[in-house]
Amino acid sequence: MSRSLKKGPFVANHLLKKVQKLNDLDEKQVIKTWSRSSVIIPIMIGHTISIHNGKEHIPLYITDLMVGHKLGEFAPTRTFKGHIKKDKKSKR
């Protein structure tokens, strides 16, 4: 079930305030956030936001094609290192 249109997209208040402050000052700084569930909105375009993946912050430059997606979609939390080539247990 999707979010109601009358509510609007979810953006964490602290993140929204930081983006608006940088827009007012006309500055470009890296914004560090742990809010992976926040939706990218048009006022974020052109900013670099560092998203926490559970271990480190991954910098992400926001473009117009990302609007409507969540920040967490662009910072994967799991790393796949590949299957073991010579695994004798799985052959049994």
UniProtKB/Swiss-Prot annotation:
| Keyword match Chloroplast | yes
Membrane-spanning residues: none
A Pfam family of the record is: Ribosomal_S19
What does UniProt give as GO cellular component? chloroplast; mitochondrial small ribosomal subunit
Cross-referenced Gene3D superfamilies, in alphabetical order? 30s Ribosomal Protein S19, Chain A
Q: Which residues form a coiled coil?
A: none
| Primary subcellular site in the record, as a coarse category | plastid
Keyword annotations: Chloroplast, Plastid, Ribonucleoprotein, Ribosomal protein, RNA-binding, rRNA-binding
Q: Which domain of life is it from?
A: Eukaryota
Q: Which GO terms describe its biological process?
A: ribosomal small subunit assembly; translation
Instruction: Please give the Gene Ontology molecular function terms for this protein.
Output: rRNA binding; structural constituent of ribosome
Q: Sorted alphabetically, which NCBIfam families does this protein's record hold?
A: rpsS_bact
What is the annotated role of this protein in its UniProt record?
Protein S19 forms a complex with S13 that binds strongly to the 16S ribosomal RNA.
Q: Which protein family is it in?
A: Belongs to the universal ribosomal protein uS19 family.
What name does UniProt use for this protein?
Answer: Small ribosomal subunit protein uS19c
**Native source species:** Tupiella akineta
